[in-house]
Every structure is written in structure tokens, then in C-alpha cells.
Amino acid sequence: MIYSDFISPQTQFYQLTVPFQLESGKVLIGVQVAYRSWGELNAQGDNGVLICHALTGSADADDWWEPLFGSGKAFNPDRDFIVCSNILGSCYGTTGPTTINPTTRKPYGVSFPKITIRDMVRLQAVLLEYLGVQSLRFVIGGSLGGMQSLEWALLYPDKVKSIAPIAVSGRHSAWCIGLSEAQRQAIYADPNWQGGNYTLDAPPNQGLAVARMMAMSTYRSWDSFTTRFGRQYDPSEKFAIASYLQHQGQKLTERFDANTYIILTHAMDGHDIARDRTAPNLSDYESVLGSIQQPTLVVAIDSDILYPPVEQQELANLIPNAQLSWLKSTHGHDAFLIDMAALNEIIQQNHEFVLF
């Protein structure tokens, strides 16, 4: 497995025994799902909690959300059966572009079919059925994970008791789509891209690093960068912020795949909870959000420039049984991965919306 160094030893794997059909009509054979679980499923199978990760995340939620785990915390293994799976199309154990195509015996690469957020959620549902989970107390996630939580409420309303979408919108904005496209173009401009048919020993790392640098700039905020870096120089006489972004770009190339980045950002751009559910106009979008009946804890980050708070306010206004809570932070979009004590407190204080 190509990125096995970044998959924890506790990760488990489930392989589907039947073909998995995507929304596009394309079919994947032998799909594998990488997942982690904590706690025990009760006899009724109704104490499930599903954590959905973001763009470059993995199933190791107890690593990237560690302060939220434990007795008296948002994720309590003594009470709940908690599951986090690596999403379809990723490179941390679940079938994606780096997976060997059983037909060609080579990695899928650029030939991996287009996927959607709904495809990701439907695969999670297959996994949970295999695990015996009958219903979920709540589904939670930030950013791309928040998109999944919204789709869970709409695709499986009888299985999901509550949801907690964090720092996300009901449909990807032109702002987000434009930023994603700029990042993809950076990858395409790398000579090693080769139309996506690069070898895994010579990937387009320069382009992927630049894409990550762009993304990191939107994951933080003006206050965050100004306070942390200002106009400081590092020992090599670069601006400290330039060194930081270059470091973050290099780090991603060591643990992530460019085709995977392309596939997942396209899936995010396609995010629209009203797509194919009703005619594509504003009133129908509003009616789809209005059809979500589950108690919903919407978390907005006041300094988020990627998914600005107006988008979470829209969710809270249109979902009938929703509560808007504010994660106040200078860290921008990534505050849900940085200010975790504050996030845990928000979840704990809103137990009527995140059902325990």
C-alpha cells in the first residue's frame, strides 16, 4: 500500500464482495474501506457515532481530534460506538486513484472515475451495515466532513438522529470552486503531471506543494498570519510566512497523492444538497434544507474566509431544528482542528442538538 506509513496499525479494512456503483453509473470492483472504531456497539445497534474527515484527513480521528475523545468528552467510547472511515477516493486505505485497478493491474491514477459526496456517504453506509450499526446518534464533520454530514441527513433520514456540520455550506460557492481550480491548475502546470499519467516514483510534487500553499492560505486568517509571522524573516532571509507555506507544501507531498487531490476537490466542487433532488433554483435549495428534520448543530468559525459564517447562518436559518454555535478563533477555517477544547465545549453544551 503506497501510503501505508500514514495509516495507523489500528486501522481495519473491509472489502466489498459486490460491485459498488457510483452516481455516474460507473462501477468499482473490489472496493476496500479503511476504518477505525472505538467503543462497543450495543445490542440494539443504536449507539453509533460517525466522524467524517476533511480533504487530506484519514480514519485516525483520535489523532487529529484527540482532545475530543474520552470520558466526558464529545466522543466517549464508554458510551458510544464511534466510527471514522477513510473516504472513497482518498489514499489512506480506501479505494482511490493510488489503488490497483483489478482490470489493468496498475494504479487507477487519472482513470479513477468521478465521485461525489453522496458516493462517499453511500460507501460509509455499506460499512456501517457490515458493522451492524442500525442507527447513528450523530454524524459530525468539518469542511468536507460537514458536507458528508448534511448528505447523511438527507440520504438516510431514518438512520441519523442528529448531525453537526462544521465550517461548511450547503453548496460549494463560486469562491471555493475558483480556489480549487487554481490549486488544480498548479498541479497541471507541473511537468511531472503528464496528463495525470505520472508514475508514483516521479509525481508532480512541485505542483501539489503549490496547491497546498494556496489552500493553507485560505485555511488560516489575516489575524493568524499577522500575529504569528508579521514581517519576520527566517535564518535564510526569507519571510517567515513564505518558509512556513513552503514547509506545509513539502509536507503534503510526502503523504498525499496529486490525482487524489484532483478527484476530491472536484467532488467538493460538486457539493450541492439540492442537486438532482429538485429543480436547480434558490427556492428548491431552501426547500431541501427545510426537509432536514434531525436536530442540527451548525458550527461557524468567526474568522473563516473559506466558508464564511454567512454560509453557516444560512444553514441554521433554513434547517428547521438547527442551532448555530460560534467557534470564536483567530485561526480561520482550520480552527476546528486547532481550537479543539473550545469545539468540544460547544458540542457538550448543545446536547439537545447532538443527541447523546
From Swiss-Prot:
The species this protein was found in: Nostoc punctiforme (strain ATCC 29133 / PCC 73102)
Gene expressing this chain: metXA
Name of this protein: Homoserine O-acetyltransferase
Function: Transfers an acetyl group from acetyl-CoA to L-homoserine, forming acetyl-L-homoserine.
AB hydrolase-1 domain segment(s): 49-337
Catalytic residues as annotated in Swiss-Prot or TrEMBL: 143 (nucleophile), 304, 333
Pfam family, one: Abhydrolase_1
Reactions catalysed, as given in the entry: L-homoserine + acetyl-CoA = O-acetyl-L-homoserine + CoA
Subunit record text: Homodimer.
